[in-house]
Amino acid sequence: MRLVFAGTPAVAVPSLTALAARFEVAAVITREDAPLGRKRILTPSPVAIAAEELGLSVIRANRLREEAIERVRVLRPDVGVVVAYGGLVHEPLLSLPRRGWVNLHFSLLPRWRGAAPVQHALIAGDRETGAAVFQLVPELDAGDVFGELRRLIRPDETAGELLDDLARSGARLLADTVAALADGTAVATPQSGEPVAAPKLGIADAKLDLTRPADEVYARFRGVTPEPGAWALLDGERFKIHAVRPTAAGVLPPGAVVADGKRILAGTGSRPLELVTVQPAGKRVMAAADWWRGAGGEAVLS
């Protein structure tokens, strides 16, 4: 089975590695090198780095347009595979591979179609999630499903932790699906149920509303960690919150911050949450207790 792979971030690397171990990867499509860090140094994507380490041909393209399409046409792949590429596959590229394109998506479709399925699952308080491999069609994440895996969501799991786990287990599912396509045993089933959208999250979505119950605040914290990154306002500036814990402490006014022994607690609409690691505006990441001492023992988050 000769394939073309399209992916960009680190979560796509396990899939590329699994596929390269079992099939001929004719080329890897990934987004162009991007400036990163304070010095804005042009940096290859994690998939580009992995592909070059595997000795694979790399096509860098932020949009799958004429040049990328022509390069894929020449390769004559049997199938195209997409894992978090960061762009849509349109015609005529969609029909170029003999078996079309398949996509590894990190949710149980049709729930959470879109760019941020793991984040939305956590924010919504879902107890179960998974990954699915489906046939790519023009409608977003709407194709027939070849296979899926299911798993429970741990109560303290962040989006980053859950996504890393699904990336590993999903890679095995994806490679097995491509093998089934190769030997003619793959069977796809139409999606069943009401679709739910999972659009990309922005900075505004990561703000914690401390007037809401603690369970809701904690669910949003987990869903936006590590990206876009949870925050609240402190003296009108963005106060980043890198780690929190649920508590059974007594009720505090929403946003009120107090010390309780060695713990730093922040009030919500129900029980407080413990602030563990924070980052005040313009400062480094630090333990909440260190920040509290420097703040003079008085702060209100909003």
UniProtKB/Swiss-Prot annotation:
Cellular component, GO annotation: cytosol
The reaction(s) this protein catalyses: L-methionyl-tRNA(fMet) + (6R)-10-formyltetrahydrofolate = N-formyl-L-methionyl-tRNA(fMet) + (6S)-5,6,7,8-tetrahydrofolate + H(+)
Enzyme nomenclature, EC number: 2.1.2.9
Enzyme class: transferase
UniProt-annotated binding residues for (6S)-5,6,7,8-tetrahydrofolate: 107-110
InterPro entries with a match to the protein in the record: Fmt, Formyl_trans_C, Formyl_transf_N, Formyl_transf_N_sf, Formyl_transferase-like_C_sf, Met-tRNA-FMT_C, Met-tRNA-FMT_N
Keywords recorded for this protein, A-Z: Protein biosynthesis, Transferase
MF terms in GO: methionyl-tRNA formyltransferase activity
Pfam families, A to Z: Formyl_trans_C, Formyl_trans_N
Role this protein plays: Attaches a formyl group to the free amino group of methionyl-tRNA(fMet). The formyl group appears to play a dual role in the initiator identity of N-formylmethionyl-tRNA by promoting its recognition by IF2 and preventing the misappropriation of this tRNA by the elongation apparatus.
UniProt record similarity statement: Belongs to the Fmt family.
NCBIfam families: fmt
Protein name, entry field: Methionyl-tRNA formyltransferase
Native species: Leifsonia xyli subsp. xyli (strain CTCB07)
